[in-house]
């Protein structure tokens, strides 16, 4: 059995936290292969989950095991941004959501080269890494600096699995019968201000709603107060509007989140995101059967298209969402994050007219959009089934740390133990 250290923000209420928990579940699916240890990290200012679920109990057991462990583990899986990865085990796999822009930083590419293998959550993230090429500051060939670049075999893509969650009714007071939904943090990347403002402008004189599950930094009362006032400013130019914007703020468990996707009055998920490494809320909405309106760029397009075979026998992809036109433009200055979102990177800027038209199309032709969403839901339930995702992790781990390597290591350890016994 291999000793495996899972390092990442596994207790945080964040995308990376959910990513770490997804990897934890994959490891748990093979107790015959993996002896799991957990080292939790923080993720920004996001809160930690301390509930007493069965999963959290197992996580805390693995944390306690880690605190008592001495020596070097066989393998580490590090669910973190690349510049936080370290070589702490015999073999090390870096796992990241990747990048939401069209360019990975030189620092990230170097860290990817310095670790044994990389796993990302989308083909978008993989392609961005492969296309981000720099000059190596150390390696020279024929008097020229060599390219610092990743090769396809150094990166694998493993997305999130579909979850089978119950729907916990929260008793929401939604007065409008037809409502859109968006889930986002109110920062530069999600472009939440445009989502809210353009919705309100399109449905100013109609009895239509938008449910916004959001925060700015955390789930505190102060955060809610600040976000509420910020959102009021986004729509203050629309005096006398009939449409409603509902703010949902605070901690929700997974059953409550899935209740939003399955609420009888919530009809469609919408976003004007600049870019996604994967887009977990979009994915959850899609596999819950909600129609989706989104720009057709970055990580979420992986799961919003259905794989099909054309009449000529060639593979193709069928879009099962309502596309929003966009332009790739340089990231805003307030979005630049050293060694993460670089100044020269670009991401998508949704077209206002196209977004409003997409909302209107869903509203007036809902039956056809719902049928399209049902087709996508059925595809994802098979394509992204939990068992398949778990198998992919096992396959990649075996590639990086083959079973025969482990068996030899274990055999040598047994010989050493026997020698000590005879001494």
Where are these regions (language model features)?
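N-terminal pre-catalytic "stem/leader" segment of glycosyltransferase-like enzymes
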Residues: 1-72, 209, 391-394, 404, ...
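Conserved donor-binding/catalytic core segment of Leloir-type glycosyltransferases
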Residues: 5, 172-190, 196-199, 210-212
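Extended catalytic core of nucleotide-activated donor transferases of GT-like folds
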Residues: 5-7, 45-128
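Donor nucleotide-sugar binding/catalytic pocket of nucleotide-sugar-dependent glycosyltransferases
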Residues: 117-167, 407
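C-terminal amphipathic helix plus adjacent low-complexity
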Residues: 216, 324-423
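Nucleotide-activated donor-binding/catalytic signature segment of Leloir-type glycosyltransferases, i.e.
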Residues: 221-263, 267
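Aromatic "clamp/platform" in nucleotide-sugar-dependent glycosyltransferases that forms part
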Residues: 274
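Short hydrophobic beta-strand element within catalytic cores of glycosyltransferases
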Residues: 291-294, 305, 311-316, 322
């Amino acid at each position: 059995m291999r000793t495996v250290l899972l390092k990442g923000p596994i207790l945080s209420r964040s995308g990376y936290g959910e990513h770490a928990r997804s990897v934890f579940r994959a490891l748990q699916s093979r107790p015959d292969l993996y002896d799991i240890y957990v080292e939790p990290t923080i993720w920004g200012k996001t809160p930690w989950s301390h509930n007493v679920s069965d999963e959290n109990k197992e996580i805390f057991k693995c944390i306690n095991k880690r605190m008592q462990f001495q020596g070097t583990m066989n393998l580490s899986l590090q669910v973190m941004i690349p510049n936080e990865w370290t070589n702490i085990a015999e073999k090390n796999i870096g796992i990241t959501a990747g990048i939401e822009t069209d360019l990975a930083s030189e620092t990230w590419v170097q860290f990817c080269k310095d670790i044994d293998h990389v796993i990302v959550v989308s083909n978008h993230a993989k392609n961005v890494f492969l296309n981000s090429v720099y000059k190596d500051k150390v390696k020279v060939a024929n008097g020229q600096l060599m390219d610092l670049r990743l090769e396809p075999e150094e990166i694998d893509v493993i997305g999130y699995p579909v979850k089978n969650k119950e729907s916990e009714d929260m008793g929401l007071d939604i007065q409008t019968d037809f409502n859109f939904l968006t889930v986002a943090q109110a920062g530069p990347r999600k472009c939440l201000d445009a989502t809210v403002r353009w919705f309100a402008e399109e449905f100013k004189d109609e009895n239509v709603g938008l449910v916004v599950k959001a925060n700015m930094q955390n789930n505190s009362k102060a955060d809610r107060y600040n976000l509420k006032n910020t959102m009021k400013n986004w729509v203050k130019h629309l005096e006398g509007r009939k449409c409603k914007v509902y703010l949902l703020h605070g901690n929700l468990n997974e059953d409550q989140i899935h209740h939003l996707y399955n609420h009888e009055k919530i009809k469609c998920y919408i976003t004007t995101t600049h870019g996604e490494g994967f887009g977990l809320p979009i994915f959850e909405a899609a596999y819950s059967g909600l129609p989706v309106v989104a720009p057709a760029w970055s990580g979420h397009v992986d799961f919003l298209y259905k794989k099909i075979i054309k009449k000529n026998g060639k593979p193709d992809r069928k879009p099962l969402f309502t596309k929003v036109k966009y332009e790739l433009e340089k990231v805003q200055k307030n979005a630049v994050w050293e060694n993460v979102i670089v100044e020269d990177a670009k991401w998508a800027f949704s077209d206002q007219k196209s977004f409003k038209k997409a909302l209107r199309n869903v509203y007036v032709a809902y039956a056809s959009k719902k049928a399209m969403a049902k087709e996508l839901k059925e595809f994802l339930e098979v394509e992204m089934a939990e068992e398949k995702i778990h198998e992919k992790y096992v396959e990649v781990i075996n590639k990086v740390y083959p079973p025969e390597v482990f068996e030899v290591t274990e055999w040598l350890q047994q010989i050493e133990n026997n020698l000590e016994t005879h001494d």
